[in-house]
Amino acid sequence: MDARNALKGLATGLMSVGIIATVPSVWAADKVFELDNFNGVAAVQGLDVGVVVGKQFLVTASSESAEQLENLKIRVEDDVLVVGREYRSGGFWDWWKHSADVSVMIQMPSLSVLKASSGAELLVEGVNCETLSIDASSGSDIEVIGRCQTATIDASSGAGVDLKRLELKTATADASSGADININLSDAFYGDASS
């Protein structure tokens, strides 16, 4: 299967489960990242990231701008796929000026760690795991669909974590500084909220 067909297949799959609304036909460019051997995803810097737990590793990105795809910095660190952008020397204004819409789609066989920060949006479907660690901060949002035995959730600085469609037995959650966490639990909950 070539990269373009794999991207179309993943986009169609994400569309069928409601993670994305349309197949990205208006995007001018797409890119496949040859990365594997990760069990977590960390999204930063306002990127939109869709994750499907599936049979194989597949990391693709689409954008209105081929330049934006070249500015993506996607790598594996400590078994976590880190999805971000390269910093430019021009500071915030240069980053803002060059921040065209970029959508990253990931397929991976198993998942145990999710992180989002700096306004990133992380939508995850097909989760079926024993334990899941979730960390959201700085205005980011994480939504997870599937089932899991237990989860540890930390949300801060205006972040949102939506687990209403994740069947959980037990969870430990900590929300601070205007963050919110929505959980669907069947057994036990341990939580802390501040600020």
Protein language model regions, located:
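Acidic (Asp/Glu) and glycine-rich low-complexity loops/linkers
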Residues: A11-S16, P24-S117, E121-D135, I145-T152, ...
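Intrinsically disordered, low-complexity segments enriched in Ser/Pro/Gly/Ala and basic residues
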Residues: M15, P24, S117, A136-G139, ...
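Short, surface-exposed interaction patches in beta-rich subdomains
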Residues: V144-S195
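Bacterial N-terminal signal peptides that target proteins for export
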Residues: D2-G13
